[in-house]
Amino acid sequence: NYNAHLAAYPQVDWEAFARRFVESLGLEFNPYTTQIEPHDALAEAFDAVARLNTIVVDLDRDVWGYVSLGYFRQKLVAGEVGSSTMPHKVNPIDFENAEGNLGVANALLAHFSHKLPISRWQRDLTDSTVLRNMGVALGYAVLAYQSLMSGLGKLEVNPQALQDDLDAAWEVLAEPVQTVMRAHGLPNPYEQLKALTRGKGITQDSMRAFIAGLDLPAPEKER
């Protein structure tokens, strides 16, 4: 408050003076604070970074899985070792590093966003030691982003693996086939496809036989 200022210079409108001074520096004036500027904006920013990091973790895990399934191949890097005992191994290490570093970053960011809005009797200094670690949290996040970009740069699609999986999953045609059946007014398309595909291994021959038996125009069957 301006009590001491007002006692010394009662003729001055201290709030107006403070506003002019702060805004002259290009800053936003906050008329209501405790002994320090509230950390609410910092907490909001840290929460936003943590949400971004969570999205990146989701991407890391998905790409790691696609590499494991063989949908993506990783370009070889000369001199890189994937395993101490398996010389053939090419690890998705960049995505693992990114995920691990983001876990550390988000642990710190969560503490920041929970701690910084709180000040015991509006005057304790526990925020000081916490604020000194902002760079640590953001540094781990930046390392993770760099690892992610490095990993993405090494990826190449494995079309053969995608084609092999697609050729082994004829049941995925259940949705478009039943939609065409509906468009032509055939009865119970969902139930028919459910009976054909649910819990069963569908082959190209069985799907072709089912389509051949439908009362559909020849051009639709050929598609």
Residue ranges and their predicted role:
Residues N1-K115:
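Internal glycine-rich alpha/beta core junctions
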Residues V81-R223:
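Catalytic-core signal marking the mid-to-C-terminal active-site face
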